[in-house]
Amino acid sequence: ATLALEGCIVTIDAMGTQPNIAQAIRNRGADYILSLKDNQPTLAGSVEDFFVAFQANPDKTPHCFDEVVEKDHGRLEVRRCYAFDQLDCLHAPERWPDLKSFGVIASERTIKGKTTIEHRFYISSLPADAARLNQAVRLHWRVENSLHWCMDVAFGDDRMRARTGNAAH
């Protein structure tokens, strides 16, 4: 059985960021937003290097920008999303089927007066659109978090003692 993905945007965590998975998504008529981390260190490094240079002089680089501010449960979160289409700065962009853009989300969280900032990197088959990227990633995490909550409540996942190695869950 296969998933009907035509017209969808598929978001995947870093572990699933592989060219063959991107190709399978495109073969089904869908677009992808793939997370970059240590799974693709050279590609992630090229996005990070580009973003560092961009921050030094943002007016010289075409880009899209979106900002979302959420305040909830004593926490303030600001997500600043930057989307780019300068693929020539990326390491081996031709490996990624129909790659059209990449993005950075700077997530700034303030809890009890302490602020942390995390930068997350993405590649996508969609045109550079910061608002769409920001929304798609946020929806991804809403689904992810609700699934973890269901596992914790329904299956007692948090009470599981076996958490490492080859232990069955």
Give names to the regions the model predicted.
Residues A22-A30:
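Short, surface-exposed basic-aromatic patches at helix termini and helix-loop junctions that form
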Residues N20-I21, T42:
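Phosphate- and divalent-cation-binding pockets in alpha/beta enzyme and binding domains
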Residues D31-I33, K37-R138:
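An anionic, glycine-rich sequence signature occurring as long contiguous blocks
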Residues A136-H169:
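Basic, amphipathic alpha-helical segments enriched in Lys/Arg and hydrophobic/aromatic residues
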Residues V10-D13, Y32, Y122, E144:
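Mobile genetic element proteins and their domesticated derivatives, centered on retroelements
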Residues M15, K37, A154:
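Anionic group-transfer/hydrolysis microenvironments
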Residues A1-I12, T17-N20:
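Conserved, well-structured functional cores that handle cations and Mg-NTP chemistry
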Residues I12-Q18, I25, A162-G165:
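Short, positively charged, Gly/Tyr-enriched micro-motifs
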